[in-house]
């Protein structure tokens, strides 16, 4: 079921809880923060079919960011923190991400060569744009031009480098019912 619908029907119900119980988010929080993040992505000039990358460890904010991309008509590429710097660099370049969401602590531990056109948004501290600060002034309501997005995953690459798998996105607004 759509998180926005859960937000209306059971706003205070927990949507996600981390395995240690320290991170929790309700459906209302997920919906509102993903809406704010969607507006933020739009403010950066991202348009339908553009891409973002998410390089995070197990963090519930991944879900909020992924949902924001999903409701903004964007591709989102999850990148494992277990990858070597060369693999991360390759995926960032290949998926044509315009924004990278990560933590400064992850950047400090890796030796990434970030593409110059990439906007880095950190979820903790650091010189990059801070996610919490960046989204705080944006509305918690959905975007008027919401569209469906999708995850762009990478195969294991049996012939060498991993291959990005990008599905076509619908041209209609998000939530549009198709005639069959």
Model-derived features: positions:
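Conserved S/T- and glycine-rich ATP-binding loop of Class I adenylate-forming
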Residues: 52, 69, 100, 155-158
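Solvent-exposed alpha-helix faces
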Residues: 35-39, 93, 105, 160
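A short N-terminal helical cap/helix-turn-helix that marks the beginning
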Residues: 1-16, 32, 150
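Structural core segment of the AMP-binding/adenylate-forming
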Residues: 43-44, 67, 71-136, 142-145
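Conserved AMP-binding/adenylate-forming core of the ANL superfamily
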Residues: 15-59, 67, 84-89
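Conserved pre-ATP/AMP-binding loop-to-beta segment of ANL
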Residues: 11-12, 58, 136-156, 160-161, ...
